[in-house]
UniProtKB/Swiss-Prot annotation:
Residues 69-81, 146-161, 226-255, 317-362 are cytoplasmic. Residues 1-47, 103-125, 183-204, 277-295 are extracellular. It comes from Caenorhabditis elegans. It is found in: Cell membrane. It comes from the Eukaryota. Belongs to the G-protein coupled receptor 1 family. B0244 subfamily. Glycans are attached at residues 7, 20, 23. Keywords: Cell membrane, G-protein coupled receptor, Glycoprotein, Membrane, Receptor, Transducer, Transmembrane, Transmembrane helix. This is Putative G-protein coupled receptor B0244.5. It is a multi-pass membrane protein. Its main location: membrane. The keyword Membrane applies. The keyword Transmembrane applies. InterPro entries: GPCR_Rhodpsn_7TM (IPR017452), Put_GPCR_Chromadorea (IPR040435).
Length: 362
């Protein structure tokens, strides 16, 4: 059989996959496009996201190492404000760790069961994270706008129950979406073909993703606007009993949270809406997709952009908590002070040791 790429000035390691794709005269350009797409997938969907998820894992781990001991010291009134915050931190930590592992699984041939379990944990982390955002936002709203109702009617037990409901709903959604996602990348108890099954899955995933993100965004926007109006109202009626620092801290945290959520939602819904209208015949190793390789740049970029944004969002969330939560900020500032003292003493001891050695040599 004649090699269709033998006269090309550019040669790729992917040529053996497409030797039978003879129904084109533009094979030299198309094989270059395949190489570019694979490079985009390697760097923007594997290497860079893996680095971001490692950073997110370290930040969330450090944040939880501060938050959990502080949470244990809190009284019941303060704990009500931090139950969903702890849940959010745990979800972010597990999400970043699972996303790291999934990047590595893409390099291996894995069974449906393994993919399902990892997608299940991954989706469970993200859906519980979304619910934690909603829960913590509503509690923040009640604590600042309706403090009497919050202190009398909302007990720690009620907040724990809402947190449990959030986890149960996340489990139901995660099982559903994990089955769909695993069926796309590996054959399981049912086969998802690209002509009939995948379009339905794309639509279902788009509806689930859009609903999951719109609810937190609407909640965050409502509470943020309400807090701004509440501040103006208290100032206009001359109510100086309300601590303005409370409103300022709440608005700052909500603004950063809303920014993070908007970033996540856009990077989830835009690619998902694009995939709903995209018809893919089969995997990229099939001739049909080889012939349209020059049209696959946008799907590759969309998929990579989605992953990168999740990595950034998982970094922004604990970083905002470390910077804007006074209780957490106080602890890590003490850690930095102690570390600087230890480094200073170590440097001083090293200098003295070198100086004594020079004196002895003389």
């Amino acid at each position: 059989m004649q090699n269709i790429f033998e006269n090309c000035s550019y040669h790729s390691k992917y040529e053996p996959y497409f030797l039978n794709c003879t129904n084109t005269t533009n094979q030299c350009v198309l094989i270059q496009d395949v190489g570019i797409i694979q490079a985009i997938d390697f760097w923007a969907n594997l290497c860079i996201p893996f680095t971001l998820f490692v950073i997110a894992f370290i930040l969330n781990g450090y944040y939880l190492s501060i938050l959990i001991p502080e949470f244990r010291k809190m009284n019941d009134t303060t704990k009500k404000q931090y139950i969903f915050v702890v849940s959010r931190g745990i979800s972010s930590l597990s999400a970043s760790s699972i996303m790291m592992v999934l990047r590595l699984l893409k390099m291996l041939s894995t069974s449906f069961t393994v993919y399902f379990l990892f997608f299940l944990i991954d989706d469970l982390s993200f859906y519980s994270l979304l619910g934690s955002y909603v829960g913590s936002t509503l509690l923040l709203y009640l604590a600042t706008v309706r403090p009497i109702f919050y202190s009398i009617q909302i007990s720690v037990r009620i907040v724990y129950k809402f947190a449990l409901v959030n986890v149960l709903l996340a489990v139901v959604l995660a099982v559903t979406t994990a089955i769909f996602q695993a069926a796309e990348v590996s054959d399981g108890f049912f086969h998802c073909d690209v002509q009939h099954c995948q379009p339905i899955i794309n639509i279902a995933m788009f509806v689930i993703i859009a609903t999951s993100f719109l609810i937190p965004i609407i909640t965050l926007t409502f509470v943020l606007v309400t807090l701004c109006f509440q501040k103006s109202r208290t100032q206009s009626i001359g109510n100086f009993t309300v601590d303005n620092s409370v409103y300022k801290s709440a608005r700052t945290r909500l603004a950063w949270t809303l920014f993070t959520f908007t970033l996540i939602s856009l990077t989830e819904m835009i690619p998902s809406s694009f995939l709903v209208n995209l018809r893919v015949e089969d995997t990229i190793t099939i001739c049909v997709n080889f012939y349209q390789a020059d049209h696959l740049f946008i799907p590759a970029i969309m998929n990579s952009f989605q992953t990168l944004a999740w990595g950034i969002a998982l970094i922004v969330d604990p970083l905002c908590a470390l910077l804007f939560d006074p209780r957490i900020r106080k602890v890590w500032v003490e850690h930095v002070s102690r570390l600087s003292i230890i480094i200073g003493r170590s440097f001083e001891a090293c200098c003295h040791s070198n100086l004594n050695k020079e004196i002895q040599d003389k």
